[in-house]
């Protein structure tokens, strides 16, 4: 996983003594927790932070550049608090990581190919959108890719079937289902039949109209 750089300020440098004051100035209050260091309160520019999250996601490996390079820390986002209605960023918790030690985190599932069973009317179900992995921070994949092109109706993919990238371990105690291709429901079949009947009816009406017009000539 690529290391993403994020400029941050200590709260003294940001000029906001309280989280509320920081938010008024366009900052997101944040704090970094480390194994051997005291928690470090920080302030992150709201706009810059949103752009980074949109580009790299919440599982990104970050290099926090503090006070224009006075210090730096390698971290991952541990928790992000947002307002439930406005989605305004309220607070961020970062966890400092050691690049030489393995960590456990979650990465999204990505599908590749066109599902054979879906072409035949089946319903592709993504049951697990994230998988837990353990690896060195620098080896965290952006996603776990699963090829679905050979899956037929009734087939499924379990976590034990998935080949993880080199250096990455899939953490699981139970061989749970990640993807399944279900048979179409009765309602789905009836809807498709109704749509086909409506389409055929429209074609017949069009043909009848053309015949009548031809007869008038």
From Swiss-Prot:
Family annotation (CDD domains): Ribosomal_L25_TL5_CTC
One GO term describing the cellular component: cytosolic large ribosomal subunit
Pfam families, A to Z: Ribosomal_L25p, Ribosomal_TL5_C
SUPFAM superfamilies: Ribosomal protein L25-like
Annotated region described as Disordered, given as residue ranges: 185-217
Bias (Acidic residues): 189-217
Keywords noted in UniProt: Ribonucleoprotein, Ribosomal protein, RNA-binding, rRNA-binding
InterPro entries cross-referenced by the UniProt entry: Rbsml_bL25/Gln-tRNA_synth_N, Ribosomal_bL25/Gln-tRNA_synth, Ribosomal_bL25_b-dom, Ribosomal_bL25_C, Ribosomal_bL25_long, Ribosomal_L25_dom, Ribosomal_uL5_bac-type
Domain of life: Bacteria
One MF annotation (Gene Ontology) recorded for this entry: 5S rRNA binding
Annotated signal sequence range: none
Record-level GO BP terms: translation
Purpose: This is one of the proteins that binds to the 5S RNA in the ribosome where it forms part of the central protuberance.
PANTHER family reported for this sequence: RIBOSOMAL PROTEIN L25/GLN-TRNA SYNTHETASE, ANTI-CODON-BINDING DOMAIN-CONTAINING PROTEIN, RIBOSOMAL PROTEIN L25_GLN-TRNA SYNTHETASE, ANTI-CODON-BINDING DOMAIN-CONTAINING PROTEIN
Similarity field: Belongs to the bacterial ribosomal protein bL25 family. CTC subfamily.
Database matches in NCBIfam families: bL25_bact_ctc
Complex formation: Part of the 50S ribosomal subunit; part of the 5S rRNA/L5/L18/L25 subcomplex. Contacts the 5S rRNA. Binds to the 5S rRNA independently of L5 and L18.
Protein name: Large ribosomal subunit protein bL25
Origin species: Desulfosudis oleivorans (strain DSM 6200 / JCM 39069 / Hxd3)
Gene name of the encoded protein: rplY
């Amino acid at each position: 996983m690529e290391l993403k750089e994020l400029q941050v300020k200590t709260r003294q440098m940001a000029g906001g003594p309280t989280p509320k004051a920081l938010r008024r100035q366009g900052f997101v209050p944040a704090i970094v927790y480390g194994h051997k260091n005291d928690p470090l309160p920080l302030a992150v520019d709201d706009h810059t932070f949103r752009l980074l999250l949109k580009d790299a996601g919440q599982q990104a490996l970050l290099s926090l550049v503090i006070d224009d390079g006075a210090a730096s820390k390698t971290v991952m986002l541990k928790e992000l608090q947002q307002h439930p209605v406005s989605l305004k960023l309220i607070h961020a918790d970062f966890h400092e990581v050691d690049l030489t030690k393995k960590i456990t985190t979650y990465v999204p599932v990505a599908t590749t190919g066109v599902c054979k069973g879906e072409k035949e009317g089946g319903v592709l179900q993504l049951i697990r959108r994230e998988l837990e992995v353990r690896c060195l921070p620098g080896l965290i994949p952006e996603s776990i890719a699963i090829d679905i092109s050979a899956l037929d109706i009734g087939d499924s993919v379990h976590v034990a079937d998935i080949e993880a990238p080199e250096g990455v371990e899939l953490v699981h105690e139970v061989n749970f289902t990640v993807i399944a291709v279900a048979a179409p429901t009765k309602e789905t079949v009836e809807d498709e039949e109704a749509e086909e009947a409506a389409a055929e009816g429209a074609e017949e009406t069009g043909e009848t109209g053309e015949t009548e017009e031809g007869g008038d000539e």
